Amino acid sequence: MRFSPTFPALRAAFLTVALFGAAAAPCRAEGLEGRFDVRSADLELAGGVYHLNARLDLPISEAVRRGLSEGVPLTLEVDLDVERVRQLLPNSRVAELTQRYDLQYNAVSARYILRNENSGQQQSLPTIDAALEQLSEVRSLPVLDKALLHPDRRYEASVRAKIDYGHVPFTLRMLMFWVNEWHRESDWYTWTLQL
């Protein structure tokens, strides 16, 4: 079986060379402009279900912006853990959730497509900045049934955001391992639940 290059394969090769060139260039402050951060988060009770609301700060470098505009997908994971706080024993996990959002540029429509991977809902946005603004707001995400929490116990919730590049082609994934711009992860943002 012979390899016959196709347009996607050639484009992936071009992106690999472009990203490799960016990785081989001397490190600059631009590559690590800011870090991911969870600015605020809370769980709001509505209809017997707790919903997550969070505000994220997601600065990305010019290299990542270029990659997105050339068709490299970006997957953001928002992880949530809810634990029962215990005195003498380790905390026990009550719930955990990983919400994934895919952001990809569609060259045909010249728009950025933001897709909620868990629900399948998607939005079409005109610019990368509009897409990142939308991505930085987690609103009314159902995460936990009220019946799982007892009012006489103490609970803590923790949220973090990170880039998952497991969905990109293998050649790019191997290269991204060495490029700092694609390794972004916030610290855990933790708060005590008010029941």
Task: Write out the residue ranges for each language-model feature.
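Sec/Tat signal peptide C-region and signal peptidase I cleavage site
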Residues: 25-29
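Short, solvent-exposed beta-strand/turn "edge" segments of beta-rich domains on protein surfaces
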Residues: 42-53, 64-72, 88-92, 147-150
